[in-house]
Regions:
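Acyl-CoA thioester-binding alpha/beta core of soluble enzymes
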Residues: 1-157, 162-171, 234-244, 328-345
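Short, flexible turn/loop "capping" segments at secondary-structure junctions
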Residues: 5-6, 183-187, 280
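Active-site-adjacent "lid/gating" segments in soluble enzymes
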Residues: 63, 75, 135-142, 211, ...
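Alpha-helical scaffold segments in soluble metabolic enzymes
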Residues: 15, 160, 207, 299-306
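Alpha-helix N-cap/helix-initiation motif
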Residues: 128-129, 197, 288-292
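Redox-cofactor-proximal catalytic regions of oxidoreductases
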Residues: 65-89, 171-207, 265-273
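Acidic glycine-/aspartate-rich tracts in secreted/extracellular proteins
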Residues: 152-155, 220-221, 249
Length: 345
């Protein structure tokens, strides 16, 4: 409606929107699962209740002063690691306990002998759209076997986003198999369809879990648990399993049920406020979906670190990644600059 009938849409929505404050609209969106988020300024980001509830915001010292500083955008087995402005190379070692590394070195050597560093690794990908599926694809490009799990009646909706065009003409073929975006995000994967409301499907999924190294998902918090596939259930059949959950705002906190697309996540995190001109309203990043691939790269980093530790120790891990926190992570220079100067970047 906003694209085809923008004036009519504004006429319907604007009067209602102006009757509410920004905080009221955010509360209504969270209560009713609406895809809406406030556009936070940089000076508001560090005071966001969701970030403090999850322990994202810590402190660092510089030039004799203390500044609020965000940690990494994920918790590993319910542990948060804080990052330092000058830290390099050792960040994840503070979150993942050290090990002897002997088995790790042996397994890595064996994998390299197969040609790719992650050969022999199996990943179950319950993700949809972009952020989680792209983690699986990058792991597949490094040699992992990735199995995409979909619901037969409700497949990944990216399957229906556009058609292949060749020489100016739409290429004919099955609707679900002809999306260039789907193949870009999911190339190289095996696939299986499971109706997880059926007990036999859950049984089959658990059989795959028992033979896998990593499970990835980006559903709303609680979705996997309601299907009988929460981390505690999965760990019972595979103690070495790593699970990566990538919801919009993390698995807990006052905004945990945030429903979002990439632009609304960018607004929630304050990134949209950086796009514009001085003394004018923020333009925002419009429809540029930075939130998805940015979360994918953070998820990949966390998953590789946890998998490395699992190979060395035999202990799995649960990774609770927040996609909006991943956006805050790339804004650290602006957050520090705003505190030092007292001005909005």
């Amino acid at each position: 409606m906003g694209t085809r009938y923008p004036e009519e849409g504004d006429a319907l929505l604007a009067p209602w929107l102006t009757r509410h404050t920004r905080d009221e609209l955010e509360a209504l969106a969270l209560e009713h699962n609406l895809i809406l988020s406030p556009l936070r300024r940089i000076d508001e980001v560090l005071a966001t209740p969701q970030f403090h509830h999850r322990g994202l915001i810590g402190n660092t010292s510089m030039d004799g002063r203390s500044y609020a500083w965000p940690g990494l955008p994920f918790r590993v087995s319910d542990r948060r690691v804080q990052s330092e402005p000058n830290l390099s190379g050792t960040l994840l070692s503070r979150c993942l306990p050290a090990s002897s590394g002997a088995e790790h070195a042996h397994r890595i050597a064996a994998s390299k002998a197969d040609g790719l560093p992650l050969a022999g690794l199996r990943v179950l990908d319950f993700g949809w759209v972009w952020s989680a599926p792209w983690v699986g694809t990058m792991l597949g490009e490094m040699g992992a076997q990735v199995i995409k799990v979909e619901h037969g009646a409700r497949p990944d909706n990216v399957r229906l986003s556009g058609r292949i065009i060749r020489d100016g003409r739409v290429v004919e073929g099955p609707n679900r198999e002809m999306s260039p975006m789907f193949h870009q995000i999911n190339h190289g994967k095996l696939g299986i369809t499971l109706n997880l409301k059926h007990p036999r499907a859950v049984e089959l999924a658990m059989g795959l879990v028992a033979q896998s190294d990593l499970v990835i998902e980006n559903m709303s918090p609680g979705s996997m648990e309601r299907s009988g596939l929460g981390f505690e259930s999965l760990r019972a059949v595979n103690a070495r399993l790593v699970m990566l959950s990538m919801s919009a705002a993390g698995q807990f906190g006052p905004a945990a049920n945030l429903r979002a697309y990439a632009p609304t996540m960018s607004a929630f995190a304050g990134l949209e406020s950086l796009v514009g001109y001085s003394n004018e309203p923020a333009i925002g990043a419009l429809n540029f979906a930075l939130g998805d691939p940015n979360a994918s790269l953070h998820g990949l980093l966390a998953a590789l670190a946890a998998l490395s530790r699992a190979r060395a120790t035999g202990e799995g891990a649960y990774i609770d990644l927040s996609q909006v926190e991943s956006l805050v992570s790339v804004m650290r220079p602006h957050l520090l600059s705003a505190q030092r100067s007292g001005r909005q970047p």
